[in-house]
Structure formats: structure tokens, C-alpha cells
């Protein structure tokens, strides 16, 4: 997809300074105590009032439940005029667009949570993250929640693919948007990263509920346990800052609006405070794609360096030094290992419970194989002095 040249990055301290706390971001003393104790999902800001409807939408027959919700959210729409469009790219949830006008300028997305995804996602925290990002201009409007999902505003633009996110004009926009999100912070003490608690939670599920039925292509549970301990020991020493992260920036979660010349990130169910380098490394892994995974598309060093320079200059408002870029480069590629491990565990759980048509087991094997393939090379990367 051809992308017109964009303006140079402004370099002033004002450009992406650390954002001021918003009124929704204050924590109670109880929440601070929970975060400091190392809960698996640090709490987000208190939820503002969002309508909640006692409607359950059937996984295999979304339309009737979706139309009940539309009657509440868009009472002026005539039922016979409502059009729908099913999006089939998602591998966690099911998504339906409801609209009347052809241009979809007013369009309600109805997202139905995937089967047993409460094992993977804290849905209460997802809504808080949605509101937090919306308060900072980084998310669409959240219209309501219902018993097994939520409804929100359709973001105008094109969902990107692996062939798009490697284009310099586009990856610059992605780097700037990630830098913006990484400046969002909660009041009070900084939460602990979600990574280790989530990975331990996923591993425990695999060990206790899934391991007897694991394919021979999947590493043994004892090996996974050793690797998880190794990751925590080595990556925790890298001093990567803890920031507010998207944590799931695959291509289809990036919407490009060519009219406005900007990108918007969608789907915040895995968002939360985490290591800066994990969010970036995870995105770099997504250059390989999901449905057809090809790690030859992992960004080359030159591409990464340019991407990281855009990111750092947006964050700092000044030029990034070679040492800063090299340091982040090493951190990002090391944390990309954790991304492989995280999503491989996730895929094993999805393989057990999900009703979505996707070969989760094959995906888990691909991610584990890539983890072990690149581990020696990545482990040898030295942090600049």
C-alpha cells in the first residue's frame, strides 16, 4: 500500500512529554497495595459509568443478540435498515459491525468474548484500559458492556498487514503512536509489570489442565518451566522501563487512516503496565504475520534501528544518541524471546478451549520453535556500556 511522505518528527521537549495524569487515573490505597503485592494484572483507573446490559450474545448466532444491543444504543435506527459485517481476522473474540449508512461513519462494533477467554484476560481491567486510552485520545468510544462482550466505535481506516508495517512512512507512525501510549501513567507508585505473573498463570494452566494431552511437538512441561525461570532471571536484569503497553500489537490491531495521516491501535484486552522492550519486541515479532507465519520478515537490524530512533526521539523530544538506540535494540530483541514464549503458552490454552477456527496448536509449535532457534543468538547480544 503506497503511503504518502509524512512531515518530519518535531524535536522539542513539548512533543511527547510525559502525559499529565487524567482524573480517571487516580488509584485508591487498596489498589496501590494490591499492585505493590504483585497481582497478576495491576488494576487500571476506576471505571467511569459505562452502560452495562444484561444481554448474552450467542457465540454461534451473534446477530439476534447484537440487534438487541443496537436497539438500546441506536434506538433511532430502523431494524430493517441495519446492515452487518462480520470480521474474521480475530483469534480471541468474534466481531460484528452494525451500521446503516454505506460509509460506516456511524458504526457500532459488537465484540463477543471467546470461549473461556476469562482464563487469559481480566475483562474488568480491559474496560478500564479502554477508558484510560480513550481519555488520552488513543482509543475509540466505548458504548457499553454486556454479559459476554462490549460495544465500541468503529475506527475509520485500513487494518494493516505484514507487508504494510515494514514501510518506513507507516512504521514511523506506529513508533510515534507507541511512544505516545508509553507516556501514559497512573497516579501513585508505578505498577509492577504484568509479564511474569501472566506467564506463570498461563504456564500453571498448561501444566495442570493441558499437559497430559500435549502434542509430542511441544516441549515437555519440565523444559518449559526451566525456560520460564531462565527468562525471568535474565530479562529482569535489563532495566527496561515499566510503561503502559498495548502488549498485542499485531498487524490487524493497527488501523491506518490515510485521510488523517495517523494510525490507531485497537483491542486492549492484553494492555497494561509492562516492560517497554516487551511491547516493541512483541510488535517486531508480528512482522512475521499470524495466519501465515514467516520469520524471514522479522525486521532487519537497519529497520529496527530506524524504528527505535523514531520512537526514542518522539519520547524524548530530542535526537537519540547511538548508545540509546543500541541499548534499546538489545533490550527489545531479548524481550522478543519472552513474546514467543508468552504467545506459545497462550496458544496452547486457546487450543484447548477456543471455538474459533484457527490452528492454535500449530501456532504454539511455531512460536516455541522460533524461541529456541533465536535464543542463542539473542542471548549473545551485549548491552552497551
Curated annotation (Swiss-Prot):
Catalytic activity entry: ethanolamine + ATP = phosphoethanolamine + ADP + H(+)
Pathway: Phospholipid metabolism; phosphatidylethanolamine biosynthesis; phosphatidylethanolamine from ethanolamine: step 1/3
Free-text disruption phenotype from the record: No visible phenotype in adults. No significant effect is seen on liver phospholipid metabolism, neural development, or testicular function. No abnormalities are detected in embryonic and adult testis morphology, differentiation, function, or fertility. PubMed:16861741 shows maternal-specific failure to support late embryonic development, resulting in reduced perinatal size and survival and suggesting compromised placental function.
BP terms from Gene Ontology: in utero embryonic development; multicellular organism growth; phosphatidylethanolamine biosynthetic process; phosphorylation; placenta development; post-embryonic development
Tissue: Expressed in testis and liver. Low expression in ovary and kidney.
Protein family (similarity comment): Belongs to the choline/ethanolamine kinase family.
Physiological role: Highly specific for ethanolamine phosphorylation. Does not have choline kinase activity.
Protein name as catalogued: Ethanolamine kinase 2
Organism (species): Mus musculus (Mouse)
Root EC class: transferase
Keywords in alphabetical order: ATP-binding, Kinase, Lipid biosynthesis, Lipid metabolism, Nucleotide-binding, Phospholipid biosynthesis, Phospholipid metabolism, Transferase
Statement: the UniProt record of this protein carries the keyword Transmembrane helix: no
EC number: 2.7.1.82
Database matches in InterPro entries: Kinase-like_dom_sf (IPR011009)
UniProt cross-references to CDD domains, sorted A to Z: ETNK_euk
Annotated Pfam families: Choline_kinase (PF01633)
Single GO MF annotation: ATP binding
